[in-house]
């Protein structure tokens, strides 16, 4: 009857999913499952916990499959019709209210029982152990045949779970309790024995993390197995606390490796976690160069090589390798400080690097450092008398700085000579240098420090091939001579600058005041002007203004070279006449003076002009040529006359004072307008076009060197 009635139900369910041809097989499976579920229910009520123990094994073995089996088994209860109306009519017709009771049990137990199509009679107690696997396969087959069962089963499971929630909860609890008993008898007992042995091992001998991890994995499988059974009831099985204890022991043993074996603790009392952390930092700094480059000549591996000295001090020394520590404050021993910190005292660094073959760890480092400092001092004193010609002061003052700068260079260069090298240096650089790979070079390094000392004073990079190439007699005088030569040149230039301005200003002054461009012919003026223009480099804006004004206005080619040419050349009247024709006309003088007076608004210009012109006339060109320096000094000291004014203009010192005076000087002689190039530059340019026209070539060029040199 069930078969005939169920097909329409399946058709309803399968039509939406288009699986009609499997209806009969699916219904048969449902019927069988339902019958088995009923039998289970009866057996549960009758036998109670006996079934629970047997079924617990099945649940424990395939507890993971319960989720998959539950939806499939519960298809029949889904038919009860509570979850969905579509399922309601067919399910109710097929299965009477007895099925409602059935699904409750089936939700928890039919999962294993579904797959057993045969042995319904014997299924009561024997089937569960075998049924789980068989049902799993059968359920999958049903899934293949009728994919509709999954949604139905899920719905039915939910419904049954809702209806018989109380019963379902009770049954798993009993199962779990039974499993707890079973696990305590089986797995926990074995685990307890194993764990007991393991504990003894952990206590007696420190086990490495790897071994314990393997043990933990094995135990974790057991703990997971038990946790699935025991977690819902929150009742711990016998083996779980033991596992927890074992983990506690493992944590204790984890600390032991950090503390290292007992012998290291005895030998190196200060090392433990700090030493481990330092090893990490140390490896990161060293890279592949490894600790073998530091411990000393023995080349012993890092931890062993330091047993020779106190572990605390060496441990402090090595962190300084990491470029972050101040060597003096960190180590408290400059002699042992490795030479790579770049932040500790440079003299100490250079002294250690040069005198200590390992660059650190040398007990005599302090003495060598003192010797090196003394040598540096003696080096300064040694060459100071030779450098009296201007080199002594600069060299003596600069030497400390230069020595510090070169100590860095010496560090890198001499570290390369060290037998084992240092951390920052690649091996390919260290190889090929004299002494690389040798056990010790203490004999060579003192001489090396001597040579480097000289090079340090000279500011040159020390060479590493031969030691006798850099003797103080050979190298130092060169440096001193070069510097002295440059200094002598500077003195000469200063003399020229001081002298030439006097000549140029003086001759220019007189020539402009007297109204002629000196005795240089016009053609010569052009050449002189061209050469001077090429050399022209104004110093500042004021000089630029003066330069422009002078180039446009100045009738004479006064520069230092111009003065010399004036002396040697025949005093030609052509230049003088040329200037006189253009510049000495009274009309131009008046017009120019009027223009300047209007702009500068200075009264009494004519009177001042007359007095100044008289002073100018008193001085002759011959006197200017013979008494240049004296006349200039006298005039300047007196502060009067054209000389003072011109000195102020070109010297820039009395620019403001000259401005009021400039108008008369310009007015006095358009001839002398050339020297006037300072404060009234703007006014002068428009006012003396004639002067610009007359000798543009020679005009400004002469004054230009004067400005430059001043």
UniProtKB/Swiss-Prot annotation:
Instruction: From the Swiss-Prot or TrEMBL record, give the protein name.
Output: Low-temperature-induced 78 kDa protein
In this chain, the stretch annotated as 5 X 5 AA repeats of [FV]-[ADT]-[EST]-[KM]-L covers: 510-600
Top-level taxon = Eukaryota
Q: Where is the composition biased (Polar residues)?
A: 169-187
One GO cellular component this record assigns the protein to is:
cytoplasm
Task: List compositional bias (Basic and acidic residues) regions by residue number.
Answer: 14-25, 49-58, 138-168, 313-331, 340-352, 367-380, 402-418, 442-466, 475-487, 564-577, 605-626, 656-670, 682-693
Q: Which UniProt keywords are listed?
A: Cytoplasm, Phosphoprotein, Repeat, Stress response
Region of interest (2 X 23 AA repeats), residue spans:
648-696
Q: Where is the composition biased (Gly residues)?
A: 638-654
| Annotated family | Belongs to the LTI78/LTI65 family.
The UniProt function text for this chain reads: Involved in responses to abiotic stresses. Regulates probably root elongation in cold conditions.
Q: Where are the sequence repeats?
A: 303-316, 317-331, 336-350, 357-370, 398-412, 510-514, 532-536, 550-554, 579-583, 596-600, 648-670, 674-696
The organism is Arabidopsis thaliana
Tissue specificity comment: Accumulates rapidly in leaves, stems, roots, flower petals, filaments, and sepals during cold-acclimation.
Q: What compartments host this protein? A: Cytoplasm
> What phenotype is described for loss of this gene?
Enhanced root growth, photosynthesis and water use efficiency (WUE) under salt stress.
Gene Ontology process terms (BP): circadian rhythm; hyperosmotic salinity response; leaf senescence; regulation of root development; response to abscisic acid; response to cold; response to mannitol; response to osmotic stress
